Amino acid sequence: MSAIDAGARAPENLWRQEIRATLALAWPMVLTNLGQTAMTATDVMMMGRLGPDTLASGALGANLYFMPLIFGLGLMLATSPMIATELGRRRYSVRDLRRTVRQGLWLAILISIPIWIVLWHGEAILLAMGQEPALAHQAGIYLRWLEWAVLPFYGYIVLRSFISALERPGWALIIVFVAVACNALFNWVFMFGNLGFPAMGIAGSGLATSLSSTLMFAGMAAVVMLEKKFRRYRLFGRFWRSDWPRFNGLLRLGLPIAGILAFEVTIFNAAALLMGLIDADSLAAHAIAIQIASISFMVPLGLNQAVTVRVGLAHGAGNPEGVSRAGWTAFVIGVSFMALMGLVMVLWPHLLISAFIDLANPANARVIALAVSFLVFAALFQVFDGAQAVAAGMLRGLHDTKVPMIYAAIGYWGVGLPLGVLLAFHFGFHGVGIWIGLSSGLAVVAALLLTRWLRRDRIAPPLAFGH
């Protein structure tokens, strides 16, 4: 083989290596995300067996629970790019990683305290929002048992970020799937009063989730203390020692991530409320379409987490070519997958819908027709959603979170929601108008994020964005 042939193959081999590394990191994260979704689905199914009132109370409580939980989750996610950059830099990486993880756990404790206070008063908050007293009371009981899941969940996220940055995410997958099984068992025991325990009803579901989250954290803590590759970092050594500059760095990086998640969650909550203003069939069809889209979104979400690590490693090493290669690899994989899923939605909508509703029941005809029409636009929605999710992870690996937060506000609340309202209620597009608005908002966010990535990738070395 000539020197020219060898030189031509070297870049090709680097791209192949990046594809393999990205997929090896992403697929356990995708399955981990699906496992966490399965835990929520288990809770819903178990609550449904206690009756519609219990299910409604659980839904109210869960919505109130997830609002502050998501904000805190954004803060915890800041540990991933910081750890990856420190690993890529290599110098003092053991000490730096230990300090970052420690400050991440400190932050988990501090942010949990106000969340506990809010959730403890869940019933009063729901009553102030005008909810039915009986439902608010049951939701309040549920929240007082559920709130203790917050801290161990955050601790689990910090430790998961650590093992993912070391490119060993398989442990998180194992732990989550054990937790899914335990969560189902705990629900069965405490909700319905089995194995000699009293029947706690909806409170039992909250207890089950708290115990499962504690199990997840305990399992992850055991892994990082006992597994050979992780043990040398001594993550819990000198846990009491502060590092305020690093703590403040986590806040600076994490607050915009929390803002992005808040904008995303609230825009989808608003879309559901708007569908409810149209009619019940539109809301039901929307719930089906969004659930289908949410399942496939687990893939770009896993790629978002993987590309943050891959870009962060190259970023810390001062390797601009590696930054570019890592970002584009994940972006192409993510968008290609979502385009394929969009095609499935367009070609076989009834097959997908049949998993959620009886197609043979004439009473469901209008819901089915609406869901089919929504899935046409959900196909476009998929591509834009995948693009923005992966692009956000690419920029996060460069510690770039403030401007993406502004882009999220512009796309979701400046374009998506107003356009959806205008099309749905002024121009008579109804539910389809809301889906067009959502798709347009995601397209704007994706375009802005990609433009920023292109500019950063071209004009500056990676370390310019690390501090």
Swiss-Prot record:
A Pfam family of this chain: MatE
Parts of the chain that traverse the membrane: 23-42, 62-84, 104-126, 141-163, 170-192, 202-224, 250-272, 287-309, 330-352, 367-384, 405-427, 432-454
GO CC terms, sorted: plasma membrane
Residue ranges of coiled coil: none
Membrane topology recorded in Swiss-Prot or TrEMBL: Multi-pass membrane protein
Stated family: Belongs to the multi antimicrobial extrusion (MATE) (TC 2.A.66.1) family.
Key words of the record: Antiport, Cell inner membrane, Cell membrane, Ion transport, Membrane, Transmembrane, Transmembrane helix, Transport
UniProt-annotated location(s): Cell inner membrane
Annotated protein name in UniProt: Probable multidrug resistance protein NorM
One of the GO biological process terms: monoatomic ion transport
Keyword match Coiled coil: no
InterPro entries in alphabetical order: MATE_fam (IPR002528), MATE_MdtK (IPR050222), MdtK-like (IPR048279)
Job of this protein: Multidrug efflux pump.
Molecular-function annotations in GO: antiporter activity; xenobiotic transmembrane transporter activity
Source organism superkingdom: Bacteria
